[in-house]
């Protein structure tokens, strides 16, 4: 299922440095984004910046599909930058990109941002105004023991429901608490948000997206999942837990880690059930990714779609 990195011919990609200073490659899971990004980096003297919220973590290799051998001699950034117990978020990602992109440009190379974490990509392409927010112990104490529905009501009293960046925060109490904390800070410190807006660097990025027909994408997801299981996904999750990463923390790292952790604990009874449940969950996740990218388009991000057809990839 791997795309050959030297085969740029099937992709109608064009990049002119006089009009753009960066490239972005996005798409749903299992669409071959990394392979295309590596080929572009080889062609245009680029350096890759990973926009994957899980590849930042050391030790999460098989389940996140790091496949570092694919990069060859191409320099890459934001892979293996923190330990599993650390918090990594969209603010840290945005700040890192704002530092990395200028350094790549100063070296007369092309920054190539690649990934499928829509929130991270959107934060850079639409330049979210983000500021660091400390933990608010008094607020946390006031909401200790509150129900999820009450916490959601508090959150929506502070933030327009249509402006919610990451709706998965609404399903997890810890993440929802953090979202409330940030919303309260933003409401009480508007001057810092304004300052963040005024100091955002400009980046002229040309954005390409890879898209497959639904049936073909599901086949690619299935093949890649089986490849990862053969490649040691279950053993990786077991080793992470043995090394001190809790089952609860492992579930935070996404579907591969969540379902594998449940299988190892006996919550999922059989291997066949585990594989089937995980495949279905990843397929649903791919649909949510595509929905996010369509939302980005509606909000002004121009995406040049490379759509797979029976005659190869066409630009739409």
Swiss-Prot record:
Reported cofactor(s): Mg(2+)
Family, similarity comment: Belongs to the IPP transferase family.
Entry superkingdom: Bacteria
Catalysis performed (reactions): adenosine(37) in tRNA + dimethylallyl diphosphate = N(6)-dimethylallyladenosine(37) in tRNA + diphosphate
Organism the protein comes from: Treponema pallidum (strain Nichols)
EC number: 2.5.1.75
Organism ancestry: Bacteria, Pseudomonadati, Spirochaetota, Spirochaetia, Spirochaetales
EC class of the enzyme, as a word: transferase
Gene designation per UniProt: miaA
HAMAP family: IPP_trans (MF_00185)
Coiled-coil residue windows: none
Residues where ATP binds: 27-34
Chain residues that bind substrate: 29-34
This protein's name: tRNA dimethylallyltransferase
Site feature Interaction with substrate tRNA, where: 117
Record Pfam families: IPPT (PF01715)
One GO MF term: tRNA dimethylallyltransferase activity
